[in-house]
Amino acid sequence: MTNATSGAKRPAWLTVFGVFSLVLFGYGMYSALVVSPPDRNQGDLIRVMYAHVPVAWLGFAAVAASAVWGMLYLWRGRAVDDVRAQANAEAGLLFSALTIFGGMTYSKPTLNTFWTWDAKLTLTALMLALIVGYFIVRGLIEEPQRRARVSAVVMIIVLASLPFNYLAAEWFRTLHPAKSVNLDGSGVSMDPVMLRVLLINVAAAAAVFIYFVSERIRIGRLALTRGQMADAAQTASQQGGREVVS
């Protein structure tokens, strides 16, 4: 059995983890819709937060991971690092799009419009556009090494935009709600039940993220192995042809 053939079969741990992710996601949604109390000011609209915040955080994490793998490719030149960078970029594209959708869902009942040029929403849209640009670059460049180098640089640029996005609500006049969970050590201003439900959904989103990226890396490595085998076979065929001619 060749490596390419053995790699085509999904590992058992990945299947089990996929089921676990689905169960945890279902429990998170149940907690958001049933367990969590309505917010004192926003009522049941707060339930959007339990999906919106986790996908936003995981979108940032995906971009950061993709950029790190891109940097490692620029340093080491290993094709598998580019595969990992692309897999995380795909997750970043998905989660960033879901972040904007969640923001628009929240905006409609509160501001009576799906879209405003709010700093936070606009910067997230810009980040999504840059990620789309990453995949456009990958589609336009055929030579694998050059494609990996250029796309790595693009993702590093996307990474540089993250601090502006994260701090937009503090730096600019924005319609985005104030943070209830602060990373600066100032604590948490949230009902304990709501916080527990939020953390459950963050864990669920993280599990889905890990499963998605792991599956995409598996498929990418399989395609990489098959491509390398095809190149080796073509090289051997050409060398055999030259020997016959000589």
Where do the protein language model's features map onto the residues?
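Polytopic transmembrane helical bundles with strong interfacial aromatic enrichment
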Residues: 1-246
